[in-house]
Amino acid sequence: MKVRSVKVITLKVNGRSYEFDVGEGRGEMPESETLVHTLRDRLGLTGVKLGCDQGACGACTVIMNGKPVTSCMMLTMDCDGAEITTIEGLADAATGKLNGLQQAFLDHCGYQCGFCTPGIIMTAQALLDKNPCPTETEVREALSGNYCRCGTHYTAVESVMAYIEQMKEERKQ
């Protein structure tokens, strides 16, 4: 008789803890499951987009333990104990009000079709969490791994820079 081994992992996603059984049995998470599939398919967080599935486009970017990561390249079982924030986790959970960076993208048309936008915003948010006043060059460099097929890179950068200026003004008051 084959003895099954099941590992239990815990993720904290958008402030909420989740446990998953990793194994080969029915209802268990396969060891090969990537974080993007766990977030989208198991947790219903469809703001995380699956683009290239090779870590090249940035559409699946989330913040894990304070750093932007491409969730299509992370095995979920390797994320045990991690704190993860998705695009859904930036908005106020009680009211649904967008955070300032998300609102800046709306106000300054930092998107076109919107498919890449969550990954771009998450990458920018991770940068701003580390450096609240980056230069435009630093913003462009941070976003260089996020691709937009519609060509809205310039409006994405403009949106981030507008948000930074807004934050500077609010700090002066």
Enumerate the language-model features and the residues they cover.
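Signature of N-terminal electron-transfer/Fe-S-associated modules in redox systems
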Residues: M1-Q173
